[in-house]
Every structure is written in C-alpha cells, then in structure tokens.
From Swiss-Prot:
<dbReference type="InterPro" id="IPR000971">
    <property type="entry name" value="Globin"/>
</dbReference>
<comment type="function">
    <text>Involved in oxygen transport from gills to the various peripheral tissues.</text>
</comment>
<dbReference type="GO" id="GO:0072562">
    <property type="term" value="C:blood microparticle"/>
</dbReference>
<dbReference type="GO" id="GO:0005344">
    <property type="term" value="F:oxygen carrier activity"/>
</dbReference>
<feature type="domain" description="Globin">
    <location>
        <begin position="2"/>
        <end position="143"/>
    </location>
</feature>
<protein>
    <recommendedName>
        <fullName>Hemoglobin anodic subunit alpha</fullName>
    </recommendedName>
</protein>
<dbReference type="GO" id="GO:0004601">
    <property type="term" value="F:peroxidase activity"/>
</dbReference>
<keyword id="KW-0408">Iron</keyword>
<dbReference type="GO" id="GO:0042744">
    <property type="term" value="P:hydrogen peroxide catabolic process"/>
</dbReference>
<dbReference type="GO" id="GO:0020037">
    <property type="term" value="F:heme binding"/>
</dbReference>
<keyword id="KW-0813">Transport</keyword>
<dbReference type="GO" id="GO:0005833">
    <property type="term" value="C:hemoglobin complex"/>
</dbReference>
<feature type="binding site" description="proximal binding residue">
    <location>
        <position position="89"/>
    </location>
    <ligand>
        <name>heme b</name>
    </ligand>
</feature>
<feature type="binding site">
    <location>
        <position position="60"/>
    </location>
    <ligand>
        <name>O2</name>
    </ligand>
</feature>
<dbReference type="GO" id="GO:0031838">
    <property type="term" value="C:haptoglobin-hemoglobin complex"/>
</dbReference>
<dbReference type="InterPro" id="IPR002338">
    <property type="entry name" value="Hemoglobin_a-typ"/>
</dbReference>
<feature type="modified residue" description="N-acetylserine">
    <location>
        <position position="2"/>
    </location>
</feature>
Length: 143
C-alpha cells in the first residue's frame, strides 16, 4: 500500500504533535509490546530488566521513535533511510520481521491514547499506511 501525497502530509503534520513526547511514547510502546507479546523479549535477553518502566526499555523506545521521526522527515526515501537498519535487523540481530508490525501496532495504540482527539479516522488511516510501509522498508533486506 503506497503512501499518497496527502498521507505523507498528514503523517508529517501529526508527527509534529508527537515529536515533543516521542521519548515517552517510544518507551510506553516498547514496554507495551514486551508485556503483551512476551515472545518479543527474546530479542532483549541481554537486558537485566525488560519491564515496561525499566531504563533499558525507555531508552530503546526513545531511540526507536527518534529513528521513526527521521524516517518521517525523509518519508519519500523510506527504504533508503532504513537500509542500514534493515541490514542490522536481518543479518546481525536476526529479528523476525513480523515483530516490526507488532511494534507499529503498539506505537499506534500509544499515540491514540496520548492524542485521542487528534487521532481522527483520517490520521489513523495515514499513520497505519505509514507503519505498513515502514515495516516493508525495514524488512527490505530479508528478501
């Protein structure tokens, strides 16, 4: 599913609201994923604590949202922007790409909870399409 110019504009505009709370949203989304989908903890076995409020979860969640923010800023070149990260996840970390969809879903849940009045059906559609494309781009090196 490709992103239209309107979708890109909606995502970029909405990201301006998300950006000031990105660290908090990232930590909450990653913590939620680890709790609701405990099988994802296997990728973080080297952490001492994978509970939702642990410093490791919060720090990595913030890093994830910072990366997504970078992708939003260069949304037209998503696959190129995510190339090295796709290599890392495919060849070194060996993360099952199905987990990217799970994380995207959890990020959308937290965004919706954080901005209930702003997460309109139009925004939901565009953000969902963005995360579908993000997942495909991050999975590019798996092919």
């Amino acid at each position: 599913m490709s992103l239209s110019a309107k979708d890109m504009a909606v995502v970029k505009g909405f990201w301006n609201k998300i950006a000031p709370k990105a660290d908090e949203i990232g930590g909450e989304a990653l913590g939620r994923m680890l709790r609701v989908f405990p099988q994802t903890k296997a990728y973080f076995a080297h952490w001492k604590d994978t509970s939702p409020n642990s410093p490791e979860v919060k720090k990595h969640g913030a890093l994830i949202l910072a990366t997504i923010g970078d992708v939003v800023n260069r949304i037209e070149n998503m696959t190129t922007v995510l190339g090295s990260l796709s290599d890392l996840h495919a060849f070194k970390l060996r993360v099952d790409p199905a987990n990217f969809k799970i994380l995207g879903h959890n990020i959308m849940v937290v965004i919706c909870m954080t901005f209930p009045n702003d997460f309109t059906p139009e925004v939901h559609l565009s953000v969902d399409k963005f995360f579908q494309n993000f997942t495909l781009a991050l999975s590019e090196r798996y092919r």
